[in-house]
Structure formats: structure tokens, C-alpha cells
């Protein structure tokens, strides 16, 4: 993934003999999003190359400004899509997700999963069922989820606008709760250490690959007053 391509994977650069292609949009760590046309290009490439397509859709409901993340299953059935209760329902510690897709792919996944652990505890599964039952007949997200997304959206605007005022070139993400930007330092680690000195934790982009060197990831998982405090510390501590 590269900045000049808006952090979208270029399938034309992927090896033709790939057995599996795994993509994640809305994307961690970049916050990048894609449309149906992009997904169709990826889907068609996988069909042409007999490549299994796996789509990590954990952030599909963490979207803003009218953007709706498309599902790969809107394009075709020969794929598998993974979802998570961690982000949408703030159930991070429960470690529960789900998969939907072509029956043959699901069958293969079940064989692998059955050898990894003994499954999620029943009480967690029941909590997830209750969460899904909160959705309306038309698929509308429950009020609790909409409220959470509004809060994340507001925090996102505060952090992005604050970083811009400090001189950073930051895109307003339409998905996830991550803010991704060029630190203007030679290395991500250099900026990360400077931020630690200010009492602020960020994630260095170098941990995500060579093309992410120099970038850092921040999150909007803290309330707005804390975000503003972090911005003030940056204003006073960075030059």
C-alpha cells in the first residue's frame, strides 16, 4: 500500500500465482476507504487468477460523512468476508467475530478454526446475538451504535483539524477511528519518541511496512477534552 495510490492495493502488482488475497477497507491503519468499482476490480482479478479473496470488514460500520462501506458480497459470492463485534459494539475484550461467504470457503475456515481453539464462551455468543437483534428490519443500526459513531466522528474532526492547525497534512478519514498522517520526521520512531516525551502515545507507521515509514497513526478512542489536551501538548512541545 502506498500514499500515492491513496493506500489502495493495486492488484495489477500482485503475483499471479497468489493463493489468497486479503484486503481490509475501511483500512487499519490508514483509514482509507474504497468503493464498489474498486472491489469489483479486486474480485475480478481474483476470479481470473483463481485466488481466494478474503475481506476484513471489521470497520464497515465505523463510517462518516454519508459514506457506506460496500460489501464484497454485493459484487459476487465467491469470496469470504470477516466482521467483528469489537469495533461496532465496543466488545474488544470479548474477541468475537464472524465470517460470511461462499459455502466452500466457510467449510475450509471451519476446519482451520476447529483446530485453533474451543470456540467463544456461550455468554459472549449470547451477547452478540442480542447486539444483532437490535438492528431494525431494514438493517438500520441501533441507536447505541449510531450514538457511538457520532461521537467518533466528532472526535475525528477535532483531532484532524487540530493537527492541520499544527501544520500537518492530514486527510479527514471516512472510516475507522484512526488518523494517519506524515510525521515530517525522518523516521516514524523518531516522531513516536518525541510524542512519548510529551506523554502522548502514537503508533509508528514503520511497523506496517516500508511504504509507511515516516507516517504515524493516532486514534480517537479518547474523549474530546483529552484529545484537545494532547493537541495543546503538541503545540507547546513540537517545533
Placement of each model-derived feature along the sequence:
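PLP-dependent class I/II
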Residues: 1-239
Amino acid at each position: 500500500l502506498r500514499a500515492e495510490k491513496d493506500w489502495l492495493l493495486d492488484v495489477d502488482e500482485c503475483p499471479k500465482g497468489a493463493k489468497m488475497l486479503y484486503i481490509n477497507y475501511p483500512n487499519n491503519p490508514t483509514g482509507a476507504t474504497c468503493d464498489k468499482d474498486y472491489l469489483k476490480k479486486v474480485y475480478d482479478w481474483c476470479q481470473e487468477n483463481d485466488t481466494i479473496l478474503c475481506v476484513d470488514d471489521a470497520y464497515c460500520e465505523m463510517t462518516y460523512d454519508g459514506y457506506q462501506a460496500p460489501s464484497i458480497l454485493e459484487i459476487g459470492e465467491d469470496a469470504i468476508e470477516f466482521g467483528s463485534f469489537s469495533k461496532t459494539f465496543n466488545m474488544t475484550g470479548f474477541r468475537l467475530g464472524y465470517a460470511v461467504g461462499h459455502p466452500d470457503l466457510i467449510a475450509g475456515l471451519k476446519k482451520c478454526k476447529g483446530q485453533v481453539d474451543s470456540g467463544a464462551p456461550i455468554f459472549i455468543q449470547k451477547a452478540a446475538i442480542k447486539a444483532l437483534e437490535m438492528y431494525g428490519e431494514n438493517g438500520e443500526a441501533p441507536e447505541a451504535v449510531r450514538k457511538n459513531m457520532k461521537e467518533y466522528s466528532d472526535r475525528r474532526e477535532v483531532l484532524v483539524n487540530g493537527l492541520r492547525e499544527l501544520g500537518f497534512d492530514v486527510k479527514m478519514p471516512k472510516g475507522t477511528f484512526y488518523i494517519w498522517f506524515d510525521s515530517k520526521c525522518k523516521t516514524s520512531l523518531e516522531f513516536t519518541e518525541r510524542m512519548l516525551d510529551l506523554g502522548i502515545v502514537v503508533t509508528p507507521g514503520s511497523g506496517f511496512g516500508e511504504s509507511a515509514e515516516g507516517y504515524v497513526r493516532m486514534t480517537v478512542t479518547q474523549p474530546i477534552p483529552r484529545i484537545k489536551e494532547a493537541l495543546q501538548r503538541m503545540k507547546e512541545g513540537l517545533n
